[in-house]
From Swiss-Prot:
Signal peptide start and end residues: 1-18
Lineage top rank: taxon: Eukaryota
Pro residues: bias regions: 29-44
Compositionally biased region (Basic residues): 76-86, 134-145
Species whose genome carries this gene: Xenopus laevis
Keyword Transferase part of the UniProt annotation: no
Subcellular location: Secreted
Main localisation: secreted
Native organism taxonomy: Eukaryota, Metazoa, Chordata, Craniata, Vertebrata
The entry's keywords: Secreted, Signal
Protein name as catalogued: Protein XA-1
Length: 198
């Protein structure tokens, strides 16, 4: 914007000469510039260390920024404020050289957390979710053909008859090895009448 105003001021000096004079008689001779559309500024050289592309009239007079020193950060930000990668603001203050908590640790006698914690007190840690493998937990998996049903599986105490409970025999399953003969005689066999006993 400043270049635009400066260009207009220079052009106004060139055009303000009287009609009869060509400008050669004036103490500073400037050739009339060709008409430039809507007053565009001259092309700017991006080489800041060699401003030879700028005519003296277009210089602003402002000094160039000083060369960078090793302690000076680039782009005006301190190096400690620069973050590399994705930074998510968490609201947690960053640790500095000072430790704000535990200011007087030497006077405190530390007790273990178990001694300070009342019974039934839970820690603030979230419990880890139990992820069953393939729908069932590893210790629930059976080796071999296991059909998951809602009925609890029978253990050895039901089959050895030590607790007094006995199960009716399954069809096609021999019960003589598991039960004694006296209990087998009391039960009627399949296909026999209830009134007849052996």
């Amino acid at each position: 914007m400043f270049f635009y105003v400066l260009l207009l001021a220079l052009m106004a000096q060139g055009w303000s000469l009287p009609q009869g004079k060509t400008g050669e008689d004036s103490p500073v001779f400037r050739p009339p510039s060709p008409p430039m559309g809507p007053s565009l500024p001259p092309p700017v050289s991006h080489d800041l260390h060699r401003p030879s592309g700028h005519p003296e009239e277009f210089r602003t007079g402002a000094s160039l920024p000083p060369k960078e020193t090793p302690n000076e950060p680039r782009h005006g930000r301190p190096k400690r404020d620069l973050h590399h990668g994705k930074v998510v603001p968490t609201g947690v203050p960053h640790h500095t050289g000072e430790v704000l908590h535990h200011t007087d640790c030497s006077s405190n006698t530390h007790k273990s957390h178990e001694e300070n914690r009342p019974k039934g007190f839970r820690t603030g840690r979230p419990l880890l979710p139990i992820k069953p493998e393939h729908g069932r937990h590893r210790r629930d998996l059976h080796h071999g053909k296991a059909v998951p049903t809602g009925v609890p599986h029978h253990t050895e105490k039901f089959h050895n008859g030590s607790n007094g409970k006995s199960h009716p025999p399954r069809p096609g399953h021999s019960t003589s090895a598991h039960n004694d003969n006296s209990s087998e005689e009391k039960r009627p066999k399949h296909g026999q009448e209830q009134g007849k006993k052996h």
